[in-house]
Amino acid sequence: MSDHPNNYPKLHNAAWPGLVGKGDGGEPPIDLDTMLDLTAAAEVDGVKFDGFDIFLYHPHFNIDGGDEETKRLAEKARARNLQVGTVVVPGYPGTGGGLPMGGKADQEKFLGQVHKTCHVARKLRELGVRPHGVVRIDSVCSVEAWSEDPKGNQKRIADTFREACKIAEDHGERLAAEGEICWGGMHSWRRMVELLEMVDCRETLGFQADMSHTLLFLMGYNAPEDALLPQDFDWNDHERFDEAYAKLTTALRPWTIDFHVAQNDGTVYGSGSHDKTGRHCLATDPKGKLDIPHHAGFWLRDESGRLTKAFRHLCWDGCMFPNATLRKRDTWNDILGAMVGVRDAHGWKG
């Protein structure tokens, strides 16, 4: 442990790789107990995961299960000496939610799921297992559908998110929107900033930065007009890459209140019911375009190099891997090792 003196930010795993891209004709989901056991078993130089983030949806969680369901989740965490961090709203159509840019019925479904999730989040705090973390939301619409009326749809999403902020404030929570190339209105760095500014609830709504998804922002995959790198970019030109990455993070870092350590090989991928989005790679993938500790620093430090300390935990995100890979202990040790490297470089003692 003396080689890794920093204890903040706390290091979390994500439980949802056992769900995202699973089912719907693909591989079956991996149950929550298995994901938590794998998380608790990982260890690097005496360092272990401190907690996990979770998507509050079947089969990992029943959002309509009442406080008893929340108590069961708290018990699962406590039994493994893990904390709960950020919780993800099941706001998608098909998970009980609706489109934020849709009509009144859709918006009410979405906001209803936000309310349920914020209640669970607050209860987990009261139960003593969730000292940090936010509530994550998405626009949950395709870029194609959003593009039919960009101005009108962006306004409706902003209006719905503003109402979601009121719900979060009533529960003592903050919301974070995760920009991904597959979510309309949040599919480029410029549109993401635009949406956050339109909502104009900076104290309550922020950005969740995922290192994999934001890499695709640089490439302008679904928004070529917002690309910061050309299509024929030479990935060996590290200086030019870092210049573009600095521009990206300068725009989004002031909004960032939640962070995903991740790797990407510069391509997109989708499986199961999940649309194509930035391909998550394993932490040790030789095709990965990111120097994880180096590029994490663009998010965790300001332009002068000072730590922002804008969030108290980091979460790994790596989805749509084969179940056989997810069940290997070495997978999680490698991931934890990458996260320890980030904390060694950009963490602090607290």
Where are these regions (language model features)?
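N-terminal pre-domain/capping segments
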Residues: 1-131, 162, 169, 243, ...
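Surface-exposed cleft-lining segments at the edges of enzyme active sites
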Residues: 102-105, 142-152, 177-184, 226-237, ...
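Active-site groove signature of glycoside hydrolases
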Residues: 118-150, 171-182, 315-316
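Active-site cleft segment of glycoside hydrolase catalytic domains centered on the general acid/base Glu
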Residues: 143-161, 167-168
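Glycine/Thr-rich phosphate-binding loops of Rossmann-like dinucleotide-binding domains
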Residues: 62, 145, 269
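A short helix->loop->beta-strand "cap" motif at the edges of active sites that frequently abuts
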Residues: 82, 130-131, 173, 305-312
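A cross-domain feature marking catalytic cores of carbohydrate-active enzymes
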Residues: 11-15, 51-58, 84-91, 137-141, ...
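Histidine-acidic metal/acid-base catalytic patches
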Residues: 1-44, 126, 158-159, 186-350
